[in-house]
């Protein structure tokens, strides 16, 4: 079996040598769209995080299996792969703790104003007339936390939010989730929460879900966190309203990645941006590779 990794750089410094047990392994750190076909045309198994595998590539290669090194599968033409008899696997559940942790890191930064206090302590505290310096910050206890997308990550965030004393409500993007532990509400009610966190996939129901028609419902001093996909929140509409309304946002995902230089969110004051790293704790990446290996091993041995 010939295995080809197309974008190993996206996995960081994780050891991939275990895959040598399954056959000949070729590792590319990055792959441009124009390079994909040449690199995989004679491969049996392709491993990709974000490199696109489309109809043309499938028609002109010998691939038998595509292992997506992520949960989202938007980069592969799944319907055509099925027609061609190509097995496609993803990895689910590996990043739940990592994404939940960054969600709370962003929320707690806004709630506790850590960046402000760090700067003050380093530059002004020594000249203070009293032992402290106070600007308003708030507790999570008693706040309403609205979740958009109550999948594995959404449920984990809900559990942790409850530990902080939050009242958790959620909006089902599929319309099918009826979790009995938390109150299911309409989107407009979620957007009136003190904290709103997005954990849903990008699909026809969630694309442009938050836009100028409903972002105005977010209250002053509330917090919007997007850990789902960039296209769920209209970035232009958010940029136009967030500072005027006086709420805050934390985004780990963007409509175009890497983020473009003209992305309107780059000019927003009340926002924290991270480069799509919520999934990528060391432990999560190690788990990802182990689960991907098990998928490929099973395919090879069948």
Language model segments and positions:
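Rossmann-like adenosine-cofactor binding region
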Residues: 41, 52-58, 174-264
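NAD(P)-binding Rossmann-fold cofactor-contacting core
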Residues: 163-179
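Glycine-rich Rossmann-fold phosphate-binding loop(s) that bind the pyrophosphate
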Residues: 8, 150-151
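Short beta->alpha connector loops at strand-helix junctions that form conserved
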Residues: 28-29, 69-70, 86-97, 172
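Phosphate-binding beta-alpha-beta segment of Rossmann-like dinucleotide-binding domains, i.e.
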Residues: 86, 92-144
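N-terminal Rossmann-fold NAD(P) dinucleotide-binding loop
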Residues: 154-155
């Amino acid at each position: 079996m010939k295995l080809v990794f197309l974008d190993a750089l996206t996995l960081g410094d994780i050891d991939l040598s275990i895959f040598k047990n399954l056959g000949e392994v070729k590792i590319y750190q990055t792959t441009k769209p124009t390079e994909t076909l040449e690199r995989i045309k004679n491969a049996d198994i392709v491993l990709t995080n974000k490199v696109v595998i489309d109809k043309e590539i499938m028609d002109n290669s010998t691939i038998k299996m595509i292992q997506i090194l992520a949960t989202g599968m938007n980069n592969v033409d799944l319907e055509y792969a099925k027609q061609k008899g190509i097995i496609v696997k993803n990895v689910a559940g590996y990043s739940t703790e990592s994404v939940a942790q960054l969600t709370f890191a962003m929320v707690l930064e806004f709630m506790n104003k850590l960046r402000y206090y760090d700067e003050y302590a380093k530059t002004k505290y020594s000249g203070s007339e009293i032992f402290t310096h106070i600007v308003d910050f708030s507790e999570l206890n008693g706040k309403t936390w609205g979740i958009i997308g109550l999948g594995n990550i959404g449920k984990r965030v809900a559990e942790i939010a409850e530990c902080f004393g939050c009242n958790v409500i959620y909006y089902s993007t599929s319309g099918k989730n009826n979790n009995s532990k938390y109150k299911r509400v309409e989107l407009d009610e979620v957007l009136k929460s003190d904290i709103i966190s997005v954990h849903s996939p990008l699909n026809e129901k969630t694309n442009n879900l938050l836009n100028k028609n409903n972002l105005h419902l977010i209250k002053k001093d509330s917090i919007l966190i997007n850990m789902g996909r960039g296209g769920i929140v209209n970035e232009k509409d958010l940029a136009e309203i967030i500072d005027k309304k006086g709420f805050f946002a934390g985004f780990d995902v963007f409509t175009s990645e890497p983020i473009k230089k003209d992305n309107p969110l780059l000019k927003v004051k009340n926002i924290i941006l991270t480069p799509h790293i919520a999934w990528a704790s060391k432990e999560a990446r190690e788990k990802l590779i182990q689960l991907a290996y098990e998928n490929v091993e099973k395919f090879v041995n069948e």
